[in-house]
């Protein structure tokens, strides 16, 4: 059986450019007919030209078809998806405007917000939208950061509303499909936005301080996305967006060892070395099985990334294994924190960020400061991705098969 990442000549025809209500067609419409400003129409173009290729890599034709041909239909009818698309489009534009130059590790969330808002007022950013044909009437100032924040807030509100409508007991099956799809796509984009944004909107992990409730974090968002997707998985995967959430390729991964994951497996065995067989309680047994499940899925994600030069399963890993990993991170289990650290380093290496400053980098720096001195494996990872800034180049993810932390290129 072929995986959903493969395509056949028949699929090449089915998913060809000849079929379509696409973002390209939307972009050929007038702004007024879509009830968009001309600024928003340009943002949609950035989403189509940059975000969609980033999410599909033009490898999985089923995914390409959904993003290019199906999502535009929801864009015109769903305020949640429209806001999420516009938020992602704005975020995509920001690095192209040089906004990364104001980011600094020493700035907190409020300071970053002020810096990005002020930088977005400069002509260097404004000129991107200053074409004569772009604005009608009086001059309009576009603050890219403010717009991104507003659209993101709209996406959050819209996705919550769609989820409540889906959960209402008096909905028809078709209404439930529509609202489930709306909630799934908008939350998929919300998770992506939060993973990519650089201004500390939420951290990767937030631990409760004494006397305070824990703040929201990316782990919660990952678990929430998986909960939505699996609330009625059979209904979702048979819908017109179902191909985005099929995981059939994970069930047909060829057996192959991955050096990076083998190292983590060996370190987990070392971690368990001090536990006697007779001391293994049901809780410890569940922990061992859960971590091994996480490592197995990480191994599969690596193999598929190399085989298809397609890293999307690496991006999805945290969502997919969140029920198994997150509870132990919340308990501050050291190996769970280390595994998340290793994954964050991989996210940096494969460029799961819009700016070098990201939730992944923040967690890596926090972990290193918290548990200094690190194990040599962890320290070598830190210098490779943070100090040396060694990233995947030219979208050549097949280099992951040679990702060996003990090799000379990781020396520091």
Q: Which residues does each predicted region cover?
A:
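Extended, leucine-rich alpha-helical cores of fungal transcription factors
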Residues: 63-84, 110, 138-146, 173-182, ...
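C-terminal effector modules of eukaryotic transcription factors
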Residues: 34, 38, 42, 73, ...
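Internal, conserved structured core segments that host functional sites
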Residues: 98, 134, 140, 144-228
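Amphipathic alpha-helical dimerization/protein-protein interaction segment
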Residues: 1-167, 408-412
């Amino acid at each position: 059986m072929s995986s959903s990442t493969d395509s056949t000549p028949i699929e090449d025809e089915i998913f060809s450019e000849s079929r379509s209500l696409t973002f390209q067609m939307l972009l050929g419409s007038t702004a007024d007919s879509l009830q968009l400003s001309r600024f928003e129409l340009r943002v949609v173009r950035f989403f189509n030209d940059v975000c969609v290729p980033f999410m599909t890599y033009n490898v999985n034709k089923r995914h390409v078809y959904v993003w290019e041909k199906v999502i535009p239909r929801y864009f015109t009818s769903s305020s949640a998806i429209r806001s999420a698309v516009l938020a992602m489009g704005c975020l995509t534009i920001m690095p192209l405007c040089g906004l990364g130059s104001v980011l600094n590790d020493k700035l907190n969330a409020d300071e970053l917000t002020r810096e990005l808002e002020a930088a977005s007022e400069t002509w260097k950013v404004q000129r991107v939208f200053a074409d004569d044909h772009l604005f009608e009437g009086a001059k309009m100032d576009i603050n890219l950061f403010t717009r991104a924040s507003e659209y993101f807030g709209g996406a959050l509100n819209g996705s919550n509303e769609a989820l409540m409508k889906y959960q209402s007991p008096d909905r028809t099956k078709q209404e439930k499909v529509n609202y489930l799809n709306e909630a799934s796509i908008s939350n998929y984009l919300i998770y992506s936005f939060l993973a990519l944004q650089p201004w500390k909107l939420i951290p990767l992990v937030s631990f409760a301080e004494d006397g305070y409730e824990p703040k929201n974090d990316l782990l919660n968002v990952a678990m929430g996305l998986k909960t939505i997707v699996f609330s009625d998985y059979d209904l979702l995967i048979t819908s017109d967006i179902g191909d985005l959430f099929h995981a059939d390729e994970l069930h047909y991964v060829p057996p192959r060892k991955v050096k990076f994951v083998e190292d983590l497996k060996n370190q987990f065995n070392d971690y368990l070395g001090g536990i006697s067989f007779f001391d293994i309680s049901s809780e410890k047994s569940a922990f061992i099985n859960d971590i091994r499940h996480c490592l197995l899925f990480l191994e599969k994600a690596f193999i598929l990334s190399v085989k298809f030069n397609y890293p999307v399963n690496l991006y999805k890993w945290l969502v997919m294994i969140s029920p198994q990993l997150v509870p132990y991170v919340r308990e501050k289990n050291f190996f769970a924190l280390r595994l998340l650290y290793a994954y964050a380093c991989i996210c940096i290496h494969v460029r799961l960020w819009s700016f070098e400053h990201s939730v992944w980098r923040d967690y890596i720096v926090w972990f290193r400061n918290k548990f200094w001195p690190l194990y040599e494996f962890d320290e070598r990872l830190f210098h490779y991705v943070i100090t040396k800034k060694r990233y995947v180049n030219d979208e050549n993810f097949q280099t992951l098969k040679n990702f060996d932390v003990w090799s000379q290129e990781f020396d520091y």
